[in-house]
Amino acid sequence: MKFAVIGNPISHSLSPVMHRANFNSLGLDDTYEALNIPIEDFHLIKEIISKKELDGFNITIPHKERIIPYLDYVDEQAINAGAVNTVLIKDGKWIGYNTDGIGYVKGLHSVYPDLENAYILILGAGGASKGIAYELAKFVKPKLTVANRTMARFESWNLNINQISLADAEKYLAEFDIVINTTPAGMAGNNESIINLKHLSPNTLMSDIVYIPYKTPILEEAERKGNHIYNGLDMFVYQGAESFKIWTNKDADINSMKTAVLQQLKGE
């Protein structure tokens, strides 16, 4: 079977390394490549994918929303998130999914098993936040809060959870067991501070969905304060495993995928 990841730029993507490691571990001769498709060429997506004879593909920035009009069917999770990161091509039909939310929550559950009783704060109200919130709401609905700089961003949300401003989030920070940053603040080249951690409880798990850099500024600050931290590496691995399951109906080798990504990050 043939797979790929599409984006622009895409040369930095670790998806090919991760998926190929999984294929090798499972003894599969499947292929996975990175395809750079600029925005101005995206209208040719059907033609490009057809020529490659792909069985499925991942979509990353900046095409997660742009792909939706080209799909024949969109899964409920992807509709809720307003973004697609996985496409299955079956009998000529393109089916869109979003595995980011379930990928993050599966990883989080492995390091924080008592999610059901956790008070959780999500920073940011973009597509990534929405996907994670919808998935977390299955476990922690009464105790889930999302904070954003502007409240207007919540107008497209159809989820009954607590919605507060970032200013209020700073005030009540000590009340949360887990704080998750889903904003671009702290990504490579972005040193913006999203929130003041002055009131962060020492028992709070501080998380970020970014894994490059391995420790974002908000994670470094929390670690200096003595908090446990959790980055986005597991989310990346688990969302990839979920994509593989959608494409093949097989379980991925999580360990081989994570090891391959870690080796790449360390330059091995």
Curated annotation (Swiss-Prot):
One of its GO terms (cellular component) is cytosol. It catalyses: shikimate + NADP(+) = 3-dehydroshikimate + NADPH + H(+). Pathway: Metabolic intermediate biosynthesis; chorismate biosynthesis; chorismate from D-erythrose 4-phosphate and phosphoenolpyruvate: step 4/7. One of its GO terms (molecular function) is shikimate 3-dehydrogenase (NADP+) activity. Shikimate binds at S13, L14, S15, T60, N85, D100, Y211. Pfam families: SDH_C, Shikimate_DH, Shikimate_dh_N. NADP(+) binds at E76, G124, A125, G126, G127, A128, N148, R149, T150, M151, A152, R153, I209, G232. GO terms for biological process: amino acid biosynthetic process; aromatic amino acid family biosynthetic process; chorismate biosynthetic process; shikimate metabolic process. It is an enzyme of class 1 (oxidoreductase). Homodimer. Belongs to the shikimate dehydrogenase family. This is Shikimate dehydrogenase (NADP(+)). It comes from Staphylococcus aureus (strain JH9).
